[in-house]
Regions:
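N-terminal secretion-targeting helices of virulence/extracellular proteins
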Residues: 1-103
Length: 103
């Protein structure tokens, strides 16, 4: 049987992991938007021709994938929080039943 302290520690750990995933997703979004997008704009301004167009299209697809991955990571973090809350509530309810039970 889990103790109240271990339930709370596990809940906080899960929330901390979700926060880390959100931070990674935020960093990926920033990288994709400002840094990578700026690089593609510089390339577009300074490199002309068929190969340049193909390379920029490839870069745009990569940028879209990076944004999609960031969105997916945010979704995973939200799911972790939801599951952690449900598990926390269930474990606390089970603990309350165990404490109230008289043998």
């Amino acid at each position: 049987m889990a103790t109240r302290e271990s339930i709370e520690i596990n809940f906080k750990a899960a929330l901390g992991q979700a926060d880390k995933i959100d931070n990674i997703a935020d960093n990926l979004s920033k990288l994709s938007g400002a840094k990578f997008g700026g690089t593609l704009q510089n390339l577009s301004a300074n490199w002309k021709g068929e190969n340049a167009s193909l390379y920029l299209e490839k870069g745009s697809r990569l940028q879209e994938k990076m944004n999609g991955t960031a969105e997916g990571l945010h979704s995973v973090a939200a799911d972790i929080r939801t599951i952690a809350r449900r598990l926390y509530e269930a474990e606390m309810a089970a603990l309350a039943v165990a404490v109230d039970r008289a043998y």
